[in-house]
Amino acid sequence: MTSIRKSHLTLKALNESMIDLPAPKNISAWWNFGSLLSLCLALQILTGLFLAMHYTSDISTAFSSVVHICRDVNYGWLIRSIHANGASFFFICIYLHIGRGLYYGSYLNKEAWSAGVILLLLVMMTAFVGYVLPWGQMSFWGATVITNLLSAIPYVGENIVQWLWGGFSVDSATLTRFFAFHFLFPFGIIAMTLVHLLFLHEKGSSNPVGINSNADKIYFHPYFIYKDLIGFAWFALFLITLVLFIPNLLGDPENFTPANPLVTPPHIKPEWYFLFAYAILRSIPNKLGGVFALLASILILLIVPILHTSKWQNFAFRPLAQIFMGLLVVDVAILTWIGGMPVEPPFIIIGQIASFLYFFLFLVFFPLSGWLENKMLESCTKSSALRALVL
């Protein structure tokens, strides 16, 4: 008799995605971040739902409602802290997931990679509108500065900004629609996650050595289910430690002050996980050029599969590419640091150099390393063939 999980229409799809899914037996802990992102998404939706029950999206009461949640709602402080710090962990997992995809050549599955980049954009938009909701100083001024960038679009920019604001400045209408967006976007994220998984499971996961593993696969359950549970345990440990001991570590002190349009903070900046893109934006003196650079810093991931020139899928056997990958990690860390610094020397020139290097690595160094490694491989192959002929 066929098991119900293999015959029932709904359970069959779940079974093929989580239980009987054939997975390469040699995938490492770097492949855990996909499941961790699912956990993060579920956690954010659950905590966000409870916060939405007590939050009011009006500029006169928004800040007070957040204070009310923390002071008067049972475990409200815990729910808010998990939601705020969970967003940071969400982006840590996303960036590590993207880094793994770059290193191990997962971008060669173009459909899954493109769906992943769209997912990244959706998550970034969700996080941005969510950052505005507490209506603190940095929330207000961050919303004003970032949304005002749309005015750089020729001809229609000013109209788009006013439409987004719901008036001539960031006000109650802006907060209401940002709350609506923040509530709705996660459903779009869920839909794109399913598309991402659909394309991923169509071809199967990559593996650390970058070769076809069809002849050597095992069931996802129980082996990788338990492996993922270990990742969940570590994730919970780090998140709860941060939430209970240093919950405000990754936040901005300015957000403890209610929004005041008459007082500008000395240094306006977004959350830490957007700082690398913000640094690239600030490195271009022209407003429209800065907006293009900001978008390009994310959308450049879409052309990574096109720029792949190596005969190897991943960087595991490519020493030159490994050096450039290390440079990229350091460069993003420098950009994140620069994004949190004031716009003054020497931070301006450091940011411009780091921004140039960021694009140069993707557009020149990675394709060049593949081409050089191919030439070295051909040279070694020819010399080996000649040696064999001589012998």
Swiss-Prot record:
What is the source species?
A: Kryptolebias marmoratus
Any one Gene Ontology MF annotation carried by this entry is:
ubiquinol-cytochrome-c reductase activity
**Cofactor binding mode and count:** Binds 2 heme b groups non-covalently.
Which Pfam families does the entry link to? Cytochrom_B_C (PF00032), Cytochrome_B (PF00033)
Which keywords appear in this protein's UniProt record, sorted alphabetically?
A: Electron transport, Heme, Iron, Membrane, Metal-binding, Mitochondrion, Mitochondrion inner membrane, Respiratory chain, Transmembrane, Transmembrane helix, Transport, Ubiquinone
Q: What exactly does this protein do?
A: Component of the ubiquinol-cytochrome c reductase complex (complex III or cytochrome b-c1 complex) that is part of the mitochondrial respiratory chain. The b-c1 complex mediates electron transfer from ubiquinol to cytochrome c. Contributes to the generation of a proton gradient across the mitochondrial membrane that is then used for ATP synthesis.
The cofactor required is:
heme b
Its protein name is: Cytochrome b
Q: Which InterPro entries match?
A: Cyt_b/b6_C, Cyt_b/b6_C_sf, Cyt_b/b6_N, Cytb/b6-like_sf, Cytochrome_b, Cytochrome_b_C_euk/bac, Cytochrome_b_N_euk/bac, Di-haem_cyt_TM
Task: Give compartment(s).
Answer: Mitochondrion inner membrane
Chain sites annotated for binding heme b b562: H83, H182
GO cellular-component terms in the record?
Answer: mitochondrial inner membrane; respiratory chain complex III
CDD domains tied to this protein: cytochrome_b_C (cd00290), Cytochrome_b_N (cd00284)
Annotated heme b b566 binding lies at H97, H196
An example GO BP is: mitochondrial electron transport, ubiquinol to cytochrome c
Instruction: Quote the subunit structure annotation.
Output: The cytochrome bc1 complex contains 3 respiratory subunits (MT-CYB, CYC1 and UQCRFS1), 2 core proteins (UQCRC1 and UQCRC2) and probably 6 low-molecular weight proteins.
Similarity field: Belongs to the cytochrome b family.
**Positions bound to a ubiquinone:** H201
Q: How does it sit in the membrane?
A: Multi-pass membrane protein
Primary localisation category: mitochondrion
